Amino acid sequence: MIADINISEKSFGDKILMTNVKFSIDDGEKIGIVGRNGIGKSTLFNILSGSDKDFSGEIVFRRGVSVASTAQEHHNLADISVINYILNGLPEYASLSKIINEYPSFMGDNIRLINEYSEALDRFNQKDFYQIEEKIKRELGNFQLENVYNQPMESLSGGQKRLVEIIKIMHSNVHLALIYEPTNHMDYVAKQQFIDWVKSQAVSNVSMLIITHDRDVLGKVDRIIELKNGGSTSYSGNYDSYLKQNAMETSSGMVNFEQVERRITSLKQKVLDYQRLKEKSRNQSTIQRFKRLENSARDELSELEKREKPSFWIDKDSIEKLNYKTAARYEKFKSKNIRVNLRSSEARSKRVVASAKNATIGYSDKILLENINIDLRENEILELRGRNGAGKTTLIKALLNYGCDLHLADKNNLDNLPTVYDGELWINPDIRIGVYEQEISDKYLNLSLKNAIEQLYLDKNLPISDTKIRQLCSDYLFTSTDLDIPIMQLSGGQKARFQIISILANDPQLLILDEPTNHLDLPSIEELESALMRYSGAIIYVSHDNYFRQKLKGEVLALG
């Protein structure tokens, strides 16, 4: 065992986030961390990395254990280059480099310092650190970041910084790696490379905690720990094993919860019965006896009613395998999920909604796409597939810019819009469109959630009311306190849910989705998949989530 985690309480103001998070980490163990958006996964990593010490409990690492984590935010980077940022984040490389670079200037004839210097040289050579910069350069190329090697970190996009963090952790050579949402912004090649690296670390005894809802990654872990109900539950095995164990545990938990509910009902009736018997009695000792029984029932009732309802979620495939009684119980007690309301009952036509004929597209005389042909009709699905930089987002922007008059997040910056040099692009002007982009329009970022929803409806010339806003927030699991939070301060999962509200506002007949599962938790991803599979309109989508792609399927347009 390299670490023992025991968090007895973690709070934010009056909100208690954790009350009983306990688990240990073994040598070489690969653990996936899952849980609903806002449950405390990021907070757990902040505690484990030492950046958050405001909690009750104890984190014990085995002596000598080194820990590295992917940074979630980047501040005060000054002008540090990408390569230096990565090298500074490699604990052993940094410490050995310090000795090798600094000792010659002052060690003189000091035997101890000479020995330390000699040992550092041997270790540096043993770890092949003389080649580390070349290895990192190749890795940057594999992640399509070959041109950022000497660029300042602060000049990179959020997605590029995330990939740099992954490269840093892949070369960190630590005992425990804390990895946050690694595959967001990765294409399918980079993602497979990351998964291969995770599998390869089995022989090097590196332990990992990976916060992710990427089911491809969760399929390669040794254990999954789910944060729920203020605590943590451990499931041995990978994602498929987790689903089976979770279904069994949830079924058992619902039986226990139902028994508690019955006990509460029984106790409430007993309190009333004892009150009536007490009032009817004329014997003082009998009155006292009923009073004691009433108080005892009230005390037990009070304790039971303090218990919060547990979180109950079972994946849809496992639900189909439940017996009738358990399935009915689940419908009664299941945790609330987002409600994705998409048109599914309308008569389905086969009219063309989008087309491209021998289109050539690019930026500033640089051609990215040639001979693009699309014939998309209602109730059809088109997947755009290719590596990052292959032109998927470019094609989407070109369709929306040339095919119709639709506001894009960067529409005001004409330099960022592609040019169609040849051929035709067209979107049916009679259909309504919903677009899920990876970035939220700047004009919404400083608005509160409530005002942003109101504004997006006004932008689409749609009626909106306070009642409607509150209903939408309820449907997408926002609380009343979330209404006043600026969009830019929402979590990744909350921003994703706001995006879904935005794209569905006008009851679209064509959905254009650019990595829609990024940041969503597992139940929300599953609900989105189910809604899209029932959808009667047309879909153009980009996704590197293999589970999501297998559900939606559709024709594939390979780019690059």
Residue ranges of model-derived segments:
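ABC ATP-binding cassette signature C-motif
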Residues: 1-257, 336-560
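Flexible nucleotide-interacting loop at or near the entrance of a catalytic core
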Residues: 114-133, 251-367
